[in-house]
Amino acid sequence: MEIFKKKNRVIAYTDGACKGNPGIGGWGAILSYNGVDKEIYGSEKDTTNNRMELMAAIKTLQALKRKCDITIYTDSKYLQNGINEWLANWKANGWKTAAKKEVKNKDLWQELDSLTNKHNVTWGWVKGHSGNAGNEKADELANKAIAELIGK
């Protein structure tokens, strides 16, 4: 894909989807490195859209075989704001929000934080369902994961 033409850097697009919230959910990602694409996806029976957005990013980082420079694009403001604005404060506050409440999806945020620290990660945001080829493919994979789970 033309959108993946950055040399020596992994470019990834991630997405999560949910049928019902909570409900059956799926996540998908497409990773590209030097022109080679890899598609990954998975699903859960009882989850939320935000958990699936987080899982897509987590599974993307878990798919890397060594320390990498990676740009991860998401259409999730929850993921984008969480990683760029909220995470440092949550950690400093003992995984509590500014309102002193437990951080939702703390388990996944902690996993994502740990994985992010193993790589040189740049986060990007794209508007969902706006014709971005990488985002559309990640969305397709997330929905494929849901369809396969429903079909079982």
Swiss-Prot record:
Q: Where does Mg(2+) 1 bind?
A: D15, E53, D75
Q: Does the keyword RNA-binding apply?
A: no
What organism is this sequence from? Francisella tularensis subsp. holarctica (strain LVS)
Which Pfam families does the UniProt record give? RNase_H
The chain positions of domain RNase H type-1 read 6-147
Which keywords does this chain's UniProt record carry?
A: Cytoplasm, Endonuclease, Hydrolase, Magnesium, Metal-binding, Nuclease
CDD domains noted in UniProt: RNase_HI_prokaryote_like (cd09278)
Q: Which gene encodes it?
A: rnhA
GO molecular function terms listed in the Swiss-Prot or TrEMBL record: magnesium ion binding; nucleic acid binding; RNA-DNA hybrid ribonuclease activity
Q: What is this protein called?
A: Ribonuclease H
**Biological processes per GO annotation:** DNA replication, removal of RNA primer
